[in-house]
Amino acid sequence: MATWIWILIALLCLVAGVALGFYIARRYMMNYLEQNPPINEDMIKTLMMQMGQKPSQKKVNQVMRSMSGSMKSPKK
């Protein structure tokens, strides 16, 4: 076969692999986020009420700030 056909086949396989990889990664992330939703303020308020604390907005904001800060800090 001609060289250009092999190049065309290789490019088509590369494009198909990238598209398939993107689809699989997207589907995995959607499934992961569905099973493990990110924490929001309502979840923190519910958690505080279950622990017997009165969830004030100041406390909720403090917990949200500390959680976002801990996620941004580098792991050692």
Curated annotation (Swiss-Prot):
It comes from Exiguobacterium sibiricum (strain DSM 17290 / CCUG 55495 / CIP 109462 / JCM 13490 / 255-15). Its main location: membrane. The keyword Cell membrane applies. Belongs to the UPF0154 family. InterPro entries: UPF0154 (IPR005359). Residues 54-76 are annotated as: Disordered. The chain crosses the membrane at residues 4-24. This is UPF0154 protein Exig_1099. The lineage of its organism: Bacteria, Bacillati, Bacillota, Bacilli, Bacillales. Keywords: Cell membrane, Membrane, Transmembrane, Transmembrane helix. The keyword Secreted does not apply.
